[in-house]
Amino acid sequence: MARIAGINIPDQKHTVIALTAIYGIGRTRAQAICAATSIAEDAKIKELSEAQIDTLREEVANYIVEGDLRREVSMNIKRLMDLGCYRGLRHRRSLPLRGQRTKTNARTRKGPRKPIRK
């Protein structure tokens, strides 16, 4: 297994699909990386030479991925909560942020039902 950005990339998959195993890289960005490194999208990882894998590593290093991206997202959410803006309050209360209804539905965000005490 090739190791890119601290993640073991599956050998049996095509390059575009295998790169999506890295947090922060989706299909579109994986295609852009393949185009920038001039590696065929349908080539499997096990078929690539070590030099090609090194060029993939260098190209992925240009993006914010994995731990850095997770940290940035959590810091953005924390910033909203500290500001006390509407989105921050909704995050703090674990409610939907973008105007969805909460009288019914929103169970995923709110968690399991709490029993009514009498």
Swiss-Prot record:
rRNA-binding recorded as keyword: yes
Keyword Acetylation: no
Superkingdom, natural source: Bacteria
MF GO annotations: rRNA binding; structural constituent of ribosome; tRNA binding
Region (Disordered): 94-118
InterPro entries recorded: Rbsml_uS13_C, Ribosomal_uS13, Ribosomal_uS13-like_H2TH, Ribosomal_uS13_bac-type, Ribosomal_uS13_CS
Keywords carried by this UniProt record: Ribonucleoprotein, Ribosomal protein, RNA-binding, rRNA-binding, tRNA-binding
BP GO annotations: translation
Gene Ontology annotations for the cellular component aspect, listed alphabetically: cytosol; small ribosomal subunit
Family recorded in the similarity comment: Belongs to the universal ribosomal protein uS13 family.
UniProt subunit comment: Part of the 30S ribosomal subunit. Forms a loose heterodimer with protein S19. Forms two bridges to the 50S subunit in the 70S ribosome.
Functional description taken from the UniProt entry: Located at the top of the head of the 30S subunit, it contacts several helices of the 16S rRNA. In the 70S ribosome it contacts the 23S rRNA (bridge B1a) and protein L5 of the 50S subunit (bridge B1b), connecting the 2 subunits; these bridges are implicated in subunit movement. Contacts the tRNAs in the A and P-sites.
Protein name in UniProt: Small ribosomal subunit protein uS13
Species: Shewanella pealeana (strain ATCC 700345 / ANG-SQ1)
